[in-house]
């Protein structure tokens, strides 16, 4: 048992981000209800981050917050806020403003560095992989942070696979697969039998009825092409 009453540790969680592109609360509420109806098991009462970077018109934050919350979604933070007035309103509402990381800025050319001595040892880069060798049953959620996830058995309906990297399923895939959970748009999903309830890469998702019929139940590879999900045969 620890001698300290609390312990702070870094961790990562998979959250959906709601990008607002309209300042009208009723429009937002209806659009969210329509999305939730498409994937209730995935989105109902889900914790979400609200991104406001797409809002140009004056915003009544209290009404917008009520519109999002009225759908059952639980706002855990706000991102993309650069307007000082809106920041004050959000802070008064008791919601945290989240940083999305530093933007890359142009840098002047670095000074020429001295030539390093010859390498005497070859360093091989190793990517971690989480391996699951047993069936993943309904209600189970498996997360592979900062690595790929490989499942060598079946994944039942109602089960959820999440990975920051790629997902490989060498069995019947009936549940939900979310690759690139931390935003890696190069992540992919590989299935030998694709019958998933939901597939997602870096937040771009399909429900089962969006999977092209010619790939349903077949060996398939999913990836992002031109910012949209696409599927290819897995040979």
From Swiss-Prot:
Organism from which the protein derives: Enterobacter sp. (strain 638)
Keywords, in A-Z order: Cell cycle, Cell division, Septation
Taxon lineage: Bacteria, Pseudomonadati, Pseudomonadota, Gammaproteobacteria, Enterobacterales
Residue ranges with Basic and acidic residues bias: 100-110
Pfam families: MinC_C (PF03775), MinC_N (PF05209)
GO biological process, any: division septum assembly
KW Kinase (keyword) present: no
Protein's name according to its UniProt entry: Probable septum site-determining protein MinC
Region (Disordered): 98-125
Family to which the UniProt record says this protein belongs: Belongs to the MinC family.
Gene that produces this protein: minC
Known partners and oligomeric status: Interacts with MinD and FtsZ.
InterPro entries to which the protein is assigned, alphabetical: CAP/MinC_C (IPR016098), MinC (IPR013033), MinC_C_sf (IPR036145), MinC_N (IPR007874), Septum_form_inhib_MinC_C (IPR005526)
Function text: Cell division inhibitor that blocks the formation of polar Z ring septums. Rapidly oscillates between the poles of the cell to destabilize FtsZ filaments that have formed before they mature into polar Z rings. Prevents FtsZ polymerization.
């Amino acid at each position: 048992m620890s001698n300290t009453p609390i312990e702070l540790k870094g961790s990562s969680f998979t959250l959906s981000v709601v990008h607002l592109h309209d300042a009208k609360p009723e429009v937002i509420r209806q659009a969210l209800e329509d999305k939730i109806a498409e994937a209730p098991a995935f989105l109902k009462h889900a914790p979400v981050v609200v991104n406001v970077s797409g809002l140009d018109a004056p915003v009544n934050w209290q009404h917008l917050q009520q519109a999002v919350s009225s759908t059952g979604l639980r706002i855990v933070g706000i991102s993309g806020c650069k307007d000082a007035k809106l920041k004050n309103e959000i802070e008064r509402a008791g919601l945290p403003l989240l940083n999305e990381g530093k933007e890359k800025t142009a840098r002047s050319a670095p000074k020429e560095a001295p030539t390093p001595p010859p390498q005497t040892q070859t360093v091989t880069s190793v990517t971690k992989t989480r391996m699951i060798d047993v069936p993943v049953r309904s209600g189970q959620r498996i997360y592979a942070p900062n690595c790929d996830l490989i499942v060598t058995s079946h994944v039942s309906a109602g089960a959820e696979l999440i990975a920051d990297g790629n997902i490989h399923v060498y069995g019947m895939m009936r549940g939900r697969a979310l690759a690139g959970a931390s935003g890696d748009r190069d992540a992919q999903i590989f299935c030998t039998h694709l019958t998933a309830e939901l597939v997602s890469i870096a937040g771009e998702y399909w429900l089962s009825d969006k999977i092209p019929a010619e790939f349903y139940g077949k060996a398939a590879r999913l990836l992002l092409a031109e910012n949209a999900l696409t599927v290819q045969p897995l040979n």
